[in-house]
Design a protein with these regions (language model features):
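Terminal leader/tail segments of proteins
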Residues: 1-122
Length: 122
C-alpha cells in the first residue's frame, strides 16, 4: 500500500547496474563537500520485509565551476569516477560508517514507534 518500485543506478568500477526493489523513502539529503567540488547524496528506504536500503552517490558539482571555466565540464566529466554505495541491512547500526549516530538514533526511535507511516483521515 505504501511501497513503490524504486530504481537506483549503481556504479562499481565503471560497471553500471540498476537495483530495482519495492520500498518507501524514509530519509534523503544532499550536501556539498568542503571544497564544494562534489555533492554527496544519501538516501534510506524501508522495504516491505523491513530491511533498510542505504544508497549513497557522489557527483561532481558542475554548478560550482562550469560557468567560470568553459571546458570544466569536459575535464570534470572525463575524470569522473562515480562513487556509489548500495547496502541492504537489518538494523540502522550497520550504517554507522555512513551516517552520524544522532541521526541513526532518531531513525531507530521512529521505527520502533511505528512512525514512518501515519494514516490520516483528512
Amino acid at each position: 500500500m505504501y511501497y513503490k518500485i524504486v530504481e537506483l543506478k549503481v556504479t562499481n568500477q565503471g560497471i553500471h547496474e540498476r537495483k530495482i526493489f519495492q520500498g518507501v523513502k524514509i530519509f534523503s539529503r544532499s550536501k556539498l563537500s568542503k571544497d564544494q567540488k562534489s555533492i554527496l547524496t544519501q538516501k534510506l528506504y524501508l522495504t516491505p520485509k523491513q530491511n533498510i536500503v542505504y544508497y549513497q552517490r557522489t557527483d561532481v558539482n558542475y554548478d560550482q565551476n562550469w560557468h567560470h571555466h568553459k571546458d570544466y565540464y569536459e575535464l570534470a566529466y572525463g575524470q569522473l569516477d562515480r562513487e556509489t554505495v548500495f547496502k541492504v541491512c537489518q538494523d540502522f547500526d550497520e550504517l554507522s560508517p555512513f551516517l552520524e549516530n544522532e541521526l541513526l538514533e532518531k531513525l531507530k526511535e521512529k521505527q520502533s514507534a511505528g512512525k514512518f507511516f501515519e494514516k490520516l483521515d483528512i
